[in-house]
Amino acid sequence: MRYRGYSIEDLAKNADFLEVAFLLIFGELPTKNQLDKLIADIQDNAIIDEDLKKILVSFPRSAHPMGILSSLTSALIAFNPEKKISLTKKTGDEHDYMYNLIVKLLAKIPILVAWVYRRRNGLSLDYGDYTQGYVENVTKMMFQRPNQKYIKNDVIVNAMNKLL
């Protein structure tokens, strides 16, 4: 199997999640500058309106995680007040608009996934630490225990990177 001409095995071995995401979205692997910009843009958008927590806690802890995640993802649009553009009428703004939406999703979905997991397990909710790598942050948000120093597990980070 191949993604945009690259074998999945090569990508799993030599690229991280954000590089593969960039490849799938834009059709080519990112340059260092493109990847650095993507990472910085994700970090800048890694805040979720606190009112989304109210929606999350309204679900029973026993509710299916995918149903909760789907609902929270749908609710993000209510907290995204920027101008909407028509993607059927070409205005020249489509690329920037789509890039910004993609960045927002890449920034917010890991937080929502971690929140759903942590809520289901009775743990406090966290925004994570985006000074770490993307996948490292996801695993920390999910598995860090309150009042304990988080120790990164490279096996879990590597497995998560390949799964994503």
Residues of each region from the PLM?
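Hydrophobic alpha-helical bundle cores within soluble ligand-binding/oligomerization subdomains
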Residues: 1-164
